[in-house]
UniProtKB/Swiss-Prot annotation:
It is found in: Cytoplasm. Belongs to the GDPGP1 family. The lineage of its organism: Eukaryota, Metazoa, Chordata, Craniata, Vertebrata. InterPro entries: GDPGP. The keyword NADP does not apply. Specific and highly efficient GDP-D-glucose phosphorylase regulating the levels of GDP-D-glucose in cells. It catalyses: GDP-alpha-D-glucose + phosphate = alpha-D-glucose 1-phosphate + GDP + H(+). The active site is at H218. Its EC number is 2.7.7.78. This is GDP-D-glucose phosphorylase 1. The orthologs in A.thaliana are GDP-L-galactose phosphorylases catalyzing the first reaction of the Smirnoff-Wheeler pathway, the major route to ascorbate biosynthesis in plants. GO terms for cellular component: cytoplasm.
Length: 385
C-alpha cells in the first residue's frame, strides 16, 4: 500500500488556521510499482456517481478527501455541484455536461502565439498559487536500490473545475518548464490513472495552441462517472511493430498508443508518445492527449474489457484563445467525447451532428494530416531499427 515517508498515516488536509497553510510542509504521497493496478478495474453495471460510490485506493482517498476539504474552505472559484448530464443520442456516445460557472468564472487564458512559446515568469504560473491549493506531492519510489529517482509532481486543485476531483499534475514548478510534454510528466499521468480504482479517472494534456491556458507544464486529471467513446473505439495498426494505431471511428481520428501496465512496455510507450509530441511541437502543430483505461487495440465491442491504458494523441489546427460563441471549446476532453457545455440554451439544443461539426472544425487539412501520420509512422519505424 502506498504510504507517506515517515508514518502509517498522513493527513492531506489543511490545518484549521489559514495562517498556518504556508508553513505546512507539502505532504508526500509515496507509491511504488506494486501500487499500480493494471488489471481488474471495470465499470460496474450501474455507473457510479462521485468517486465515493466506488471502492477507493489510497490515491483516490487522498485526492478526494483533500479536494473535498478545499471545496469546503472555498478555495475554488465556484462550488461545483452535481452537473446536469446527458448522453447525446447518436452513434458516438458523447457525454455532455452543463457547466455554466466554468465558462463564466475560469481564469482568462494567456496570450499564446506559438506552440513553442517560452515560459514567461511575469505571466500567471503555478509558482503563484495559494499554499492551500496544493493537495500533495506524488513521489515515486525507485523500483530497485540505486535506480534514478523520478521527479516529484505536485497535485494541485484546478480552481475552475470541470468535474469532481479536477486536479493539475505539475512537475517541479520551480523549474519553470513551458507547456511541452516531457517523459516524467507523462509517466506521472499514466501512473495516476493506474493508482486509481475508479475506471473514470482520466488524465490529459493540452499543448499551446491546443487550448492550454497556462504556459507552465501541467496535465489535467479528473473523475467522470461515464464511459467515453475512446475507451473501446476500434483501431487499425499503422506500423509493422503494432506500436501506433489509428482510431478512425471518432469525429476527429486520433493516434492510439496502448500498454498493459507498468514495466518495460510502459517505458517504451512513454518514449514513443514523447517522440511524437516532440515532432508535433517542433513543427508548430498543436495537439491534445488523453489517458484512460481502455481495451487493447484492434476490433473491439462495447463489452470489451478495460485491460490496459490507452493514450490517444490528436494533432489539430492551432486555436489561440477561447471562442465565446461556441457551445464548447475543443480540447482534450471534448476530443475524447466529454463535452462541458457553457450555457443552458446550448445544452438543451446540442445534437450529435452539431458536436461533430465543432470537433471536425479543429482537424488538420487532409494533406497535412497525411504528412503527420507518415512522419509518426516513420518515427515508430526508427525505434525498431
Amino acid at each position: 500500500m502506498a504510504l507517506p515517508h515517515d508514518s502509517n498515516e498522513t493527513s492531506y488536509l489543511l490545518p484549521p488556521n489559514n495562517e498556518d497553510w504556508g508553513r505546512q510542509t507539502i505532504p508526500d504521497f509515496v507509491y511504488g510499482q506494486k501500487d499500480l493496478m493494471a488489471e481488474g478495474i471495470q465499470w460496474p453495471r450501474n455507473a457510479p456517481g462521485i468517486p465515493d460510490a466506488l471502492p477507493q485506493s489510497p490515491f483516490d482517498a487522498a485526492l478526494c478527501s483533500a479536494w473535498k476539504q478545499r471545496v469546503e474552505l472555498g478555495l475554488f472559484r465556484y462550488r461545483l455541484r452535481e452537473l446536469q448530464t446527458q448522453i447525446l443520442p447518436g452513434a458516438v456516445g458523447f457525454v455532455a455536461q452543463l457547466n455554466v460557472e466554468r465558462g463564466v468564472q475560469r481564469r482568462p487564458p494567456q496570450t499564446i502565439k506559438s506552440v513553442r512559446q517560452a515560459f514567461d515568469p511575469v505571466q500567471f504560473n503555478f509558482n503563484k498559487i495559494r499554499p492551500g491549493e496544493v493537495l500533495f506531492r506524488l513521489h515515486r519510489e525507485p523500483d530497485l536500490p540505486g535506480t534514478l529517482l523520478q521527479e516529484d509532481i505536485l497535485v494541485v486543485i484546478n480552481v475552475s473545475p470541470l468535474e469532481w476531483g479536477h486536479v493539475l499534475l505539475v512537475p517541479e514548478p520551480a523549474r519553470q518548464l513551458p507547456q511541452r510534454l516531457l517523459p516524467g510528466a507523462l509517466r506521472a499521468g499514466i501512473e495516476a490513472v493506474l493508482l486509481s480504482l475508479h475506471p473514470g479517472f482520466r488524465v490529459g494534456f493540452n499543448s499551446l495552441g491546443g487550448l492550454a491556458s497556462v504556459n507552465h507544464l501541467h496535465l489535467h486529471g479528473y473523475y467522470l462517472a461515464h464511459r467515453l467513446p475512446v475507451e473501446q473505439a476500434p483501431s487499425e495498426p499503422l506500423d509493422p511493430g503494432g506500436h501506433l494505431h489509428l482510431l478512425q471511428d471518432l469525429p476527429a481520428p486520433g493516434f492510439l498508443f496502448y500498454t498493459r501496465g507498468p514495466g518495460p512496455d510502459l517505458e517504451s510507450l512513454i518514449s514513443r508518445v514523447c517522440r511524437a509530441t516532440d515532432y508535433l511541437t517542433d513543427h508548430e502543430i498543436a495537439h491534445n492527449l488523453f489517458v484512460t483505461r481502455g481495451a487493447p487495440p484492434g476490433k473491439t465491442s462495447p463489452s470489451s474489457a478495460l485491460t490496459g491504458v490507452r493514450v490517444i494523441l490528436w494533432a489539430r489546427k492551432s486555436s489561440f484563445g477561447i471562442k465565446d460563441g461556441e457551445a464548447f471549446n475543443v480540447a482534450l476532453c471534448e476530443l475524447a467525447g466529454h463535452l462541458p457545455v457553457k450555457t443552458s440554451q446550448d445544452f438543451s439544443s446540442l445534437t450529435e451532428a452539431a458536436a461533430v461539426a465543432l470537433i471536425q472544425d479543429c482537424r488538420l487539412p487532409p494533406s497535412q494530416a497525411e504528412d503527420v501520420q507518415a512522419a509518426l509512422v516513420a518515427l515508430m519505424s526508427q525505434e525498431e531499427q
